[in-house]
From Swiss-Prot:
Membrane spanning stretches: none
Domain of life assignment: Bacteria
Main location: cytoplasm
Name the UniProt record assigns to this protein: Histidine--tRNA ligase
PROSITE patterns: AA_TRNA_LIGASE_II
Subcellular location per the Swiss-Prot or TrEMBL entry: Cytoplasm
GO cellular component: cytoplasm
Gene Ontology BP, a term: histidyl-tRNA aminoacylation
E.C. code: 6.1.1.21
């Protein structure tokens, strides 16, 4: 019986060129987050299922349809993380980080898992960058997290390919009034709604606004607007966020139906979308989640239960589809000892060059012509030959593979020559 060699459906191998693009996106995001005062953090990709049961919302698509859930050998229910925020908040509570100096600002990246229909920009194993600011309830914190997202997209040369949509879900009082209005409105169309939306009508009508069903969308287009149900405090908060964005020159569109797909959001929610990646239009999204800490059982030393927080995540695969970045190949130096007698001389030079941060490989097998062919195949910039003459004269014969020119360089001038003449 033959072994199945293809990756599991919805996963893929990241070969060097695509890996380089992913690595570039993560590096840009990490470096910019550091300028904003964020620190790196990493959590396990596997968590107890309860972490997500308590945070994502029982009627969310993620929890009801997309989670990878299984029993471990101790008969404990565990899940592959479908997103980062709940795991980060668990780490904060477990490690008592909430009682350190606030705010906490964390950058993380890595794989997440959702059992979904694979298509362009959407895999069952996918990769994200994730940023969380925990412990700051100011409107500027909301604006700053959007500004960081904008700076990442700008550095990736994607600002002209995306649009920022923003909304506010208001405070709990605002949401309660709005949800009642939605129940009254959608109840008139109960039989016309999709089965998923019918099941959400009573417990979480906000989620109907997030439905991907085309008929649901048509009904939602005339639904009441949450903007008519804000408390004065919620309205002032959102107005201040928008004021900061305008001051920073960030263009946005208010989308009254934007609610995001998870239940822990409140106040500001936002998405950067693009029309250039097919059905998966959202490339980056996030919002405020002030109630998540309390929902997960967290407590502050002061006795308070609420820990404000805001963050966002971006899909690396989707960013990679949009960016035109091409990883720059580092062209190595190839050392070719002309015979076995000089292998050790070649290995000594190999170590010397690597210790000086020069990418170098050594080729010890086959004829000189075959080794030159391999050097050309890996796009080496130069070949260094070592033989009896070179050892005797304490020199190296160097061939430039772009021009085919050769030169002889004495030992103590080799480093400066390579540093000045290699791309």
């Amino acid at each position: 019986m033959s072994i199945k060699l293809q990756p599991v459906k919805g996963s893929k191998d990241l070969l060097p060129e695509e890996f380089g693009k992913h690595d570039y996106i993560v590096s840009v995001s990490r470096n910019l987050s550091q300028l904003y005062g964020f620190q790196p953090i990493s959590t396990p990709i596997i968590e107890y299922t309860e972490i997500f049961n308590r945070t994502l919302g029982k009627d969310s698509d993620v929890l009801s349809k997309e989670m990878y859930v299984f029993l471990d050998k101790g008969n404990r229910s565990v899940s592959l993380r479908p997103e980062f925020t709940a795991s980060i908040m668990r780490a904060v509570i477990y490690n008592n980080l909430q009682n350190k100096k606030l705010p906490l600002k964390y950058f993380s990246s890595g794989p997440a898992f959702r059992y979904d229909n694979p298509q362009a920009g959407r895999q069952r194993q996918f990769h994200q960058i994730n940023l969380e600011c925990i412990g700051d309830d100011s409107p500027f914190s909301d604006a700053e997290i959007v500004l960081l997202a904008h700076d990442i997209l700008k550095t990736l040369n994607l600002v002209d390919k995306v649009n920022l949509e923003i909304n506010s879900l208001g405070c709990m009082e605002s949401r309660a009034k709005y949800q009642q209005a939605l129940v009254e409105y959608f109840s008139k169309y109960r039989t016309e709604l999709s089965q998923d939306s019918q099941s959400r009508l009573i417990e979480n009508p906000l989620r109907i606004l997030d439905s991907k069903n085309l008929h649901d969308k048509k009904i939602s287009a005339s639904a009441p607007s949450i903007h008519d149900y804000y408390t004065i405090k919620s309205r002032c908060y959102f107005d201040k966020v928008l004021e900061y964005l305008e001051f920073c020159g960030i263009k946005y569109t208010i989308n009254a139906n934007l609610v995001r797909g998870l239940d822990y959001y409140c106040h500001t929610v936002f998405e950067y979308t693009s029309t250039q990646i097919g059905a998966q239009s959202t490339v980056l999204g996030g919002g405020r989640y002030d109630g998540l800490f309390e929902q997960m059982g967290g407590k502050l030393a002061s006795g308070k239960k609420t820990l404000p927080a805001i963050g966002f995540a971006a899909g690396i695969e989707r960013l990679a589809l949009l960016t035109n970045y091409t990883p720059v190949d580092v062209r190595p130096i190839v050392i070719i000892p002309v015979d076995e007698e000089h292998h050790q001389h070649g290995i000594m030079l190999l170590q010397k060059l690597r210790n000086n941060n020069i990418t170098t490989v050594i080729d010890l097998q086959d004829s000189i012509s075959k080794r030159l062919n391999r050097a050309n195949y890996i796009k080496a910039s130069k070949v260094i030959f070592i033989g009896a003459i070179e050892v005797r004269e304490q020199s190296y014969r160097i061939k430039d593979l772009d021009t085919s020119n050769e030169c002889v360089i004495i030992h103590n001038e080799l480093l400066s020559y390579l540093q000045n003449n290699c791309s």
